[in-house]
Curated annotation (Swiss-Prot):
Residues holding GTP 3: 54-57
Organism placement in taxonomy: Bacteria, Pseudomonadati, Pseudomonadota, Gammaproteobacteria, Legionellales
The species this protein was found in: Legionella pneumophila subsp. pneumophila (strain Philadelphia 1 / ATCC 33152 / DSM 7513)
Boundaries of every FeoB-type G domain copy: 1-167
List of residues binding GTP 1: 8-15
The protein, known as: Fe(2+) transporter FeoB
Length: 751
C-alpha cells in the first residue's frame, strides 16, 4: 500500500482533486486532540492500494504559536508526524510563483514529492503557458498537468504515485556565508540531539523561520534564544532567498500573454469593491438570492406540495379508511408519516434554489469579495472581517459555520464567530419562512424573507459587539484574503454542488421530521385519561394540554390560547428547525380536520393534475412577482381549505406571523448547533448562547408585536416594551459586570 499526503494552498483545487482520486471511498473523522476534520480516501490501481490523506490548505509550513489556526498547525505537524510514502503538492497553475513557496518547504523534508499542476485550462485561458517538462527538470520531481474539475490528467497522476520512491533534494538557496553557517550549526545541534539528518535539515529551517511549535519545547526555546542572539533576521533572509530562487524558476518555465480575464476582473472589481457602491451591491446580491429562492424555487413548491399530499396524506388516509382502520391509525399514518414526508419534500424547490445561488456566488469568485467588503464595516466595530466567511456558510447550516471558525487565527476571533453564527438564517429556517410567506405574505414575500435574513445578520453583529465590549475584549486580527479572478462556473458543477447539499439537507430533515410527526400524531390521539381520541381533534389530548400550559408565556408576542400548535412548534424546533414546519403541518391538519376532509373527497388523478397544473400557473405569475411584487397575485382562494388557511385564522394576522418568525429566527437553531458550540468553545459559552438567544428572541418578538398593536392597547404595549427593554439591559449588565467572565484562558477548557 502507498500512503500519500495531499497538500496545497487554499483554493488550489485540492478538495476537487481528492474527490476525483477517491470518488466515494472516503472517511471523515477528526485529527487527534482537536476538532479539525480529517479526510482520508483510497483507490485501487490494478492490485495496488493507494491511500490519500487530505491535509488542510496552508500557505506555509511554519507553525508560529501566535496567530496560527488549528488547520495550519495540523498541516505543519502532519508532514512530520504521519507515516507516508510521498506527498502530492497541488499547485494552481494560474499562480505558480506564489504556490511554489510551499513546494520549496516541502522539498526540505527529503520525501518523494509529486507536483499536481492544477487548473491548466484556466491558466491557458488567461494567457499563461507553462513548460511542464522544464519545470520538472528544474524541480527534480514529477510534474503532472491536470484539470481536476474535468478529471483530465488524473490517470497520469495516479500512475506517478506508483513510481514516487525518488527522494527530493532541497532547492539551492543563495544565502550569505554567515546565515548558512548559523543554519549548519542549528542542524548539527539537532543531529547531536538524536534527530535524523533529513529531519535535522528541515527542523533547522523551520526554527530559523520562527517556528515555535516544532520539536521538544525546552530544546526548541533554547535554540530560538541563541538565534535571537545572532542578530541575523534569518526568517527574512530565508524568505527572500526562496522567492529569488522561485522567481528564477518561474522566469524560465512560464510565459504570460495578455490576459483578458485579468482586465475584466480589474474592471469589475472597480465597481464591486468601490468605496461607496460595494455595500449596496453586496446587499443587492443577498436580496437577489432570496428573490431567486422564494420566487423561482417557490414556483415549483405547489407541485411538490400537492403531489405528495395527494399520495402520502390523502391517499394513505383514503386507503386506510377503505380498510376500516381505527382513527388513531389513520392519524399516525396519514397525518404523521404522510405529513412528515409531504413536509420534507415540499422544502426541496426553495432550498435547492438557495443552494444553487450560493454555489453560483462561491464559484464565480464573488463570495471572497463579499468577505472583503464586509470586513471594513465589521472592523469598524472591532469585529473580525474574516469571520464573515464562516457566517456565510451559516446560510446553509449553522453547524458547519461554527466548525469553519476553527480556520481563524486568533482564539478571540474564533470565539466571537462561534457566538455570532447561530443568528445566521440556515436553510431549515428558510423552509419555515417559505410556509409563512405563502400563508400571510402572498405579495412581496421575498421582501419579508430578506428582512429576516438582514435582522439575523444585524443581531449577529450586535452580539459580537457586546462580547467585544465585555468578555472577549481585544483587537480584530487583519484580514488576509486571496481574491480569485472572476470566471463563469459550469452548470454541471453548480448542479452537482447543489445536489450534494440538497441530499444532505433532505436526509437530515426527513429522519427528524417524520419520527417527530409520528410522535406528535400519537400524542394528539391519546387523551389525558389514557384513552384514544376519535378522528376529530379535541382539546383533551396530551399534546393539546401540554401546548395550552405553555402558550400563555407567548401571549405578549401574539400567540393566543387557541394557537397552541404554534407553541408546540417552537418546542420541537429546539431539536431541529426542520421539525417546526412538520409540527405545524401535522397539528393544524389534525386540529382543522384536514385529514378527514381530504380522505372523504379523495381524487388521486385530480390531485396529480392539479400538481402539474400549478407549475405553468406559478411561472406565468413570475414576471409580476419579480418586477412588481407589491401587485403580485393574492393568495389562492382555496387557501382556507388547507393548513395554510387554518394557520391564517389562528395567528393574529401578518403582524402575529412576523413576530413568530422573529422568534424562530433568533432563538437557538437546534441542539446540534448547541453541541458544536460546546465542542468548539466550552460549556459556559454554550449556555450563554442559549440564554442570550432566548432573551433577544423573546424581547424582539414582544417589542415588535406590541409596537405594531400599540394603538389597540397603548398602556399594555408600553408596559411590555419597557419590561423587555429592562430585561435586555439587565442581561447586558450581567455580561458586563459578571465576576465569572469568560476570559480566553477558560475558552479552551472543554469542560
Amino acid at each position: 500500500m502507498t500512503h500519500a499526503l495531499l497538500i496545497g494552498n487554499p483554493n488550489c483545487g485540492k478538495t476537487t482533486l481528492f474527490n476525483a482520486l477517491t470518488n466515494a471511498n472516503q472517511r471523515v473523522g477528526n485529527w487527534p486532540g482537536v476538532t479539525v476534520e480529517k479526510k482520508t480516501g483510497e483507490f485501487l490501481l490494478g492490485e495496488h492500494l493507494i491511500e490519500i490523506t487530505d491535509l488542510p490548505g496552508v500557505y506555509s509550513l511554519v507553525a508560529n504559536a501566535e496567530g496560527i489556526s488549528q488547520d495550519e498547525q495540523i498541516a505543519a505537524q502532519s508532514v512530520i508526524d504521519l507515516e507516508y510514502d510521498c506527498i502530492i503538492n497541488v499547485i494552481d497553475a494560474c499562480h505558480l510563483e506564489r504556490h511554489l513557496y510551499l513546494t520549496s518547504q516541502l522539498f526540505e523534508l527529503g520525501k518523494p514529492v509529486v507536483v499536481a499542476l492544477n487548473m491548466m485550462d484556466i491558466a491557458e485561458h488567461r494567457g499563461i503557458s507553462i513548460d511542464t517538462e522544464k519545470l520538472e527538470s528544474l524541480l527534480g520531481c514529477s510534474v503532472i498537468p491536470i484539470q481536476a474539475h474535468k478529471n483530465i490528467g488524473i490517470p497520469a497522476l495516479q500512475q506517478s504515485l506508483l513510481h514516487c520512491s525518488q527522494k527530493i533534494k532541497p532547492l539551492k538557496l543563495s544565502l550569505s556565508v554567515a546565515a548558512q553557517q548559523i543554519l549548519n550549526d542549528l542542524e548539527n545541534q539537532l543531529i547531536s540531539k538524536g534527530y535524523k539528518n533529513s529531519f535535522a535539515y528541515y527542523f533547522s529551517r523551520r526554527l530559523a523561520e520562527g517556528d515555535t511549535l516544532i520539536g521538544e519545547k525546552a530544546f526548541t526555546e533554547s535554540l530560538l534564544i541563541k538565534l535571537q542572539e545572532t542578530e541575523q533576521n534569518l526568517d527574512v533572509l530565508l524568505a527572500d532567498a526562496r522567492y529569488q530562487k522561485i522567481h528564477e524558476i518561474v522566469t524560465l518555465v512560464q510565459k504570460k500573454h495578455s490576459d483578458a480575464s485579468e482586465h475584466f476582473t480589474a474592471k469589475l472589481d472597480k465597481l464591486v469593491l468601490h468605496r461607496f457602491l460595494a455595500l449596496p451591491i453586496f446587499f443587492a446580491m443577498m436580496y437577489l438570492m432570496f428573490l431567486f429562492a422564494i420566487n423561482i424555487g417557490g414556483a415549483f413548491q405547489d407541485f411538490f406540495d400537492i403531489s405528495t399530499e395527494t399520495i402520502f396524506v390523502q391517499g394513505s388516509g383514503w386507503l386506510l379508511q377503505q380498510l376500516h382502520a381505527p382513527h388513531w391509525v389513520i392519524a399516525l399514518v396519514a397525518n404523521g408519516v404522510g405529513k412528515g414526508i409531504n413536509t420534507t419534500i415540499t422544502f426541496i424547490p426553495v432550498i435547492a434554489a438557495m443552494f444553487f445561488f450560493l454555489s453560483l456566488l462561491e464559484t464565480s469568485g464573488y463570495m471572497a469579495r463579499a468577505a472583503f467588503v464586509v470586513d471594513k464595516a465589521m472592523r469598524a466595530m472591532g469585529l473580525p472581517g474574516k469571520s464573515f466567511v464562516p457566517m456565510i456558510v451559516g446560510f446553509g447550516c449553522n453547524v458547519p459555520a461554527i466548525m469553519a471558525a476553527r480556520t481563524l487565527d486568533s482564539e478571540r476571533d474564533r470565539l466571537l464567530t462561534v457566538m455570532m453564527s447561530p443568528f445566521m438564517s440556515c436553510s431549515a429556517r428558510l423552509a419555515i419562512y417559505a410556509v409563512f410567506v405563502a400563508a400571510f405574505f402572498p405579495s412581496g414575500g421575498h421582501n419579508v424573507v430578506f428582512s429576516l435574513y438582514l435582522i439575523g445578520i444585524l443581531m449577529a453583529v450586535f452580539t459580537g459587539y457586546i462580547l467585544r465590549k465585555t468578555t472577549l475584549k481585544g483587537h480584530a486580527s487583519p484580514l488576509i484574503l486571496e481574491l480569485p479572478a472572476y470566471h463563469r462556473p459550469s452548470l454541471r458543477r453548480l448542479l452537482r454542488e447543489t445536489s450534494m447539499r440538497l441530499r444532505f439537507f433532505v436526509y437530515r430533515a426527513g429522519k427528524l421530521i417524520i419520527p417527530i410527526c409520528v410522535i406528535l400524531g400519537g400524542l394528539n390521539a391519546i387523551t389525558w385519561g389514557g384513552g384514544i381520541s376519535s378522528g376529530e381533534a379535541n382539546t383533551d389530548s396530551l399534546l393539546s394540554i401540554m401546548g395550552q400550559w405553555i402558550t400563555p408565556l407567548f401571549a405578549p408576542m401574539g400567540i393566543h390560547q387557541d394557537n397552541w400548535p404554534a407553541t408546540v412548534g417552537l418546542l420541537t424546533g429546539m431539536l431541529a428547525k426542520e421539525v417546526v414546519v412538520g409540527t405545524l403541518n401535522s397539528l393544524y391538519a389534525q386540529v382543522g380536520h384536514v385529514g378527514e376532509i381530504a380522505a372523504a373527497h379523495f381524487d388521486f388523478w385530480g390531485g396529480i393534475k392539479a400538481a402539474f397544473g400549478s407549475i405553468p400557473a406559478n411561472l406565468s405569475e413570475l414576471g409580476s412577482a419579480l418586477w412588481n411584487p407589491v401587485s403580485a397575485s393574492a393568495a389562492d382562494s382555496e387557501l382556507s381549505q388547507s393548513v395554510y388557511g387554518i394557520m391564517s385564522r389562528r395567528f393574529d394576522g401578518a403582524v402575529g406571523a412576523y413576530a413568530y418568525l422573529l422568534f424562530v429566527l433568533l432563538y437557538i437553531p437546534c441542539v446540534s448547533t448547541m453541541a458544536v458550540i460546546r465542542q468548539e468553545a466550552n460549556k459556559r459559552f454554550m449556555w450563554t448562547s442559549i440564554v442570550w438567544s432566548f432573551v433577544v428572541a423573546y424581547a424582539t418578538s414582544v417589542v415588535f408585536y406590541q409596537g405594531a398593536k400599540f394603538l389597540d392597547h397603548p398602556q399594555q404595549s408600553m408596559v411590555w416594551i419597557l419590561a423587555m427593554s429592562l430585561s435586555l439591559l439587565f442581561v447586558l449588565a450581567v455580561f458586563r459586570y459578571s465576576q465569572y467572565g469568560m476570559g480566553r484562558q477558560n475558552a479552551a477548557a472543554n469542560t
